[in-house]
């Protein structure tokens, strides 16, 4: 039927209580009262944006994986564009830039090719910050 996780009923309900509490605490503000925009690069499913929306920011995400973008759009107020970012990608005006560039080019678990790795997103991230300043 499914994979057995080895949780007792008490463990399961403790996790569910915690999950419910966190979801309530991080519920995005519908009115986005701060009138400030956050651009989330390499947004994934929107974990960083979730915190900013909970604080009242408007968010705009950019993510190349369709499944992650769909999750972002399903759970957050802001939009998420599905596209592969480039150094010259245009972004909307924003007061804050956040994101999670891929770590594989620098991770000790990989080949550490750095700037030679095609997945290196740091130049894109830095370019966005410079242009949005």
Regions found by a protein language model. Give the residues of each.
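Conserved active-site and SAM-binding loop architecture
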Residues: 1-133
């Amino acid at each position: 039927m499914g994979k057995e996780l080895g949780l007792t009923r008490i463990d399961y309900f403790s996790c569910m209580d915690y999950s419910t509490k966190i979801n309530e605490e991080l519920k995005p503000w519908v009115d986005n009262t701060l009138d400030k925009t956050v651009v989330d690069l390499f947004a994934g499913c929107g974990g960083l944006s979730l915190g900013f929306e909970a604080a009242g920011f408007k968010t705009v995400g950019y993510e190349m994986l369709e499944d992650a973008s769909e999750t972002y759009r399903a759970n957050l107020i802001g939009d998420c564009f599905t596209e592969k970012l480039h150094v010259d990608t245009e972004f909307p005006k924003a007061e804050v830039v956040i994101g999670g560039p891929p770590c594989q080019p620098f991770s000790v678990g990989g080949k550490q090719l750095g700037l030679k790795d095609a997945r290196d997103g740091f130049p894109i991230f830095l370019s966005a910050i410079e242009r949005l300043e």
